[in-house]
Amino acid sequence: MKKKQKQAAIGFIFITMLIDITGWGIIIPVIPKLIAELINGDISEASKYGGWLTFAYAITQFVCAPLIGNLSDKYGRRPIILISLFAFSLDYLLLAFSPTIIWLFIGRIIAGLTGASITTASAYIADVSTPENRAKNFGMIGAAFGLGFIIGPVIGGLLG
């Protein structure tokens, strides 16, 4: 891969992670109220469902991440990251327009099934980085995390 292509790939990964983490950040302040409205309960009851939603996402991601990793080895990092972003978009649409709590669970499970974008992005960074630039390039993922977790909750707070 040429130097320009590697730089473009690193930029793609940074933007992808920024979008991904900003999306996570947006739902943080919104989800408790959304759950409470869907279950017609208070915030205490909503927190129980929030825990189960988090578990549903985490367990499906835990189970499917090795499969996603194998697929990224076979078909390339970029297509897997793009599919993962599409699935996250679908998850966020389901979160926004869920008529019932079940749809929230469906959305989080879909996101968990394809939620290996961070590990795939890390593998992509390792693939395109020279040993001298690897730490700097991994730092870009950290910067995307930090920026996403600043921007996302602000947007979520304004929308929620």
Residue ranges with predicted function:
Residues 107-146:
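Cytoplasmic helix-loop-helix junction between adjacent transmembrane helices
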Residues 32, 148-160:
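Small-residue (Gly/Pro/Ala) motifs that create kinks and tight helix-helix packing interfaces
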Residues 58-66, 116, 149-150:
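Residue-level signature of mid-helix packing/kink "hotspots" within the transmembrane helices
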Residues 62-99:
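Conserved MFS/SLC helix-loop-helix module at the cytosolic interface between two early adjacent transmembrane helices
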Residues 6-37:
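Pair of pore-lining "gating" transmembrane helices in MFS-fold secondary transporters
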Residues 18, 91, 102-116:
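Hydrophobic core of transmembrane alpha-helices in multi-pass small-molecule transporters
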Residues 34-62:
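Extracellular/periplasmic helix-loop-helix junction of adjacent transmembrane segments
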Residues 36, 71-72, 158-160:
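Interfacial helix-cap and linker-helix signal at transmembrane-aqueous boundaries
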